[in-house]
């Protein structure tokens, strides 16, 4: 008998081998119809997979995240099937699942047009309605290579030829189309009902710029129509909020080809930057951090000791001077260890918290650069905590509380926490990792937060806590990290004198809350659609006169606001007041003050809040009180 244990703990027994589909049928017709795949002892398999031993089994439907991934993977193959039907000369390459969708790369003699995409999507719908069965076949490698070569599919043949000869090859067949894939796939094309092709872009074969340029068709696929509609609406909102457009329209920053991946900050954009930096500086000082500054360029020997030269060199900008090799720092940690090492440290000095708004540079591929979100030159709110093993929990707890408080001040109330655990390849003993992982768990538990654990996702030198913030349109952004480093202090010779006068290695906690300033400012701009709260807005107030006779009064109001620390300016142009109001409203200024003769004579201002909200006429002192409250409350 074969015993199948289901997710609810119940068991079903079968006299002999049984497929996932047959198990689903034994539970109920509805489940059998909904089944997309199975999960056998944690591994995803097709519904046709035959079970010949005792296992734990979950039936995967479109209600499961794994089920949606199977739908997307299968839709990528449906896309390739449709392309081959319409354009037989096109050659197929690869088609993986990505976040919210999939893509497939093709080699074809001409670029695909928007009209082609519409025709391909229509053909995909036709193939879905045919509800053709999707079957898995096992081939040996050489026969599979010969098959694809005979079909003129040189790219697919090349992929298969790179697989070890003794490894079985899985091919999936639907109708006239056959493709290489590890699977699993939906049982038939009729399961694929909700999809949309999004765009076409260029992509190099195997990601190598020296290879041929292919065409990558992107698509999205979902279990339900309403899920896809919500996603497409979110994309429309994201397009409106694109920080690159806002940067231009609000005159905050620009990028140009002469400095790829590096930002030219304009006065208003730099004002926002300074508001964020000064806020973070105040929070770090209050939390017991000492701010430091380390060199931008350091000798190769230091990067060799830290391991960056061996493991990270291709992402570093390097240079030579007087026959010595140097690198522009891609991160701040080795420099902070040098400060720790400068002088003899005692256990009484710990924990030592060193913070730096450190400018770093990483040689990211030009094709990966994206506005402020992916750059080559960036500044981090970086800090490193040197502490004893006994202090890990308290320091991690304090950091977690600080991070949540900062996110709350910036308006991010929904924060997800993930704990990345030991990878297969790692430094340090299991005992040390047990202690490190449990220390981070204890800290998170002490803070009362829920977290998701990601086995195998930690760095080789230690486990990591990640902080993911959700923005106004539901997108998740990973910003903060807390990483426990068991390796760098040893590589760079960091030590302190313990209470018993022995020499010990400190534990090193790498931590950041915002991450890259550039990226965080991009997230902020998109979250608020450019309408930054008053405490962050580059211009908090614009004072406008109706006629020349109020110009002096308007200027006096501005000077009064400036002296009280607010960011204000006067618009004294000889233009209609409606024109001025409209122009500054488009610049998303939090408050517009209008002054005429009545306001001047009474020492008052007519106040309009952003969004064309008329707050009426009030004394200047009352407006100042309101604005100060906004700034204090981070409104």
UniProtKB/Swiss-Prot annotation:
Pfam families: HGTP_anticodon, TGS, tRNA-synt_2b, tRNA_SAD. It catalyses: tRNA(Thr) + L-threonine + ATP = L-threonyl-tRNA(Thr) + AMP + diphosphate + H(+). GO terms for biological process: threonyl-tRNA aminoacylation. Its EC number is 6.1.1.3. Its cofactor is Zn(2+). GO terms for molecular function: ATP binding; metal ion binding; threonine-tRNA ligase activity; tRNA binding. GO terms for cellular component: cytosol. PROSITE patterns: AA_TRNA_LIGASE_II, TGS. Zn(2+) binds at residues 333, 384, 510. Residues 1-61 form the TGS domain. It comes from the Bacteria. InterPro entries: aa-tRNA-synt_IIb, aa-tRNA-synth_II, aa-tRNA-synth_II/BPL/LPL, Anticodon-bd, Anticodon-bd_dom_sf, Beta-grasp_dom_sf, TGS, TGS-like. Disulfide bonds: none annotated. Keywords: Aminoacyl-tRNA synthetase, ATP-binding, Cytoplasm, Ligase, Metal-binding, Nucleotide-binding, Protein biosynthesis, RNA-binding, tRNA-binding, Zinc. Binds 1 zinc ion per subunit. It is found in: Cytoplasm. SMART domains: tRNA_SAD. Residues 242-533 are annotated as: Catalytic. Catalyzes the attachment of threonine to tRNA(Thr) in a two-step reaction: L-threonine is first activated by ATP to form Thr-AMP and then transferred to the acceptor end of tRNA(Thr). Also edits incorrectly charged L-seryl-tRNA(Thr). Homodimer. Belongs to the class-II aminoacyl-tRNA synthetase family. This is Threonine--tRNA ligase. It comes from Cupriavidus pinatubonensis (strain JMP 134 / LMG 1197) (Cupriavidus necator (strain JMP 134)). The lineage of its organism: Bacteria, Pseudomonadati, Pseudomonadota, Betaproteobacteria, Burkholderiales. The gene is thrS.
